[in-house]
Amino acid sequence: MRIFSLIVAGLVLLIQLHPAKGTLYRRFLCKKMKGRCETACLSFEKKIGTCRADLTPLCCKEKKKH
């Protein structure tokens, strides 16, 4: 019975780590678009996407000057 509980605990940990893979990919895309992950975009920045992390949900990029 103890081994069963260890297997279930391991599966729960794997399920919790699965969404983290998407977060890393979104952060990579944000860096590729020359942006950065922040909690809130500054007034001179625009939101170009999401990083989907708890602490840094937005991908921000500096606005181009015309």
UniProtKB/Swiss-Prot annotation:
Disulfide cross-links: C30-C59, C37-C51, C41-C60
Signal sequence segment: 1-22
InterPro entries named in the record: Beta_defensin_dom
Pfam family, one: Defensin_beta_2
GO terms for cellular component: extracellular region
Swiss-Prot/TrEMBL GO biological process terms: defense response to bacterium; innate immune response
Protein localization: Secreted
Keywords assigned: Antibiotic, Antimicrobial, Defensin, Disulfide bond, Secreted, Signal
Domain of life: Eukaryota
GO MF term list: lipid binding
Function text: Has antibacterial activity.
Family, as annotated: Belongs to the beta-defensin family.
Protein name: Beta-defensin 13
Taxonomic source organism: Rattus norvegicus
Gene: Defb13
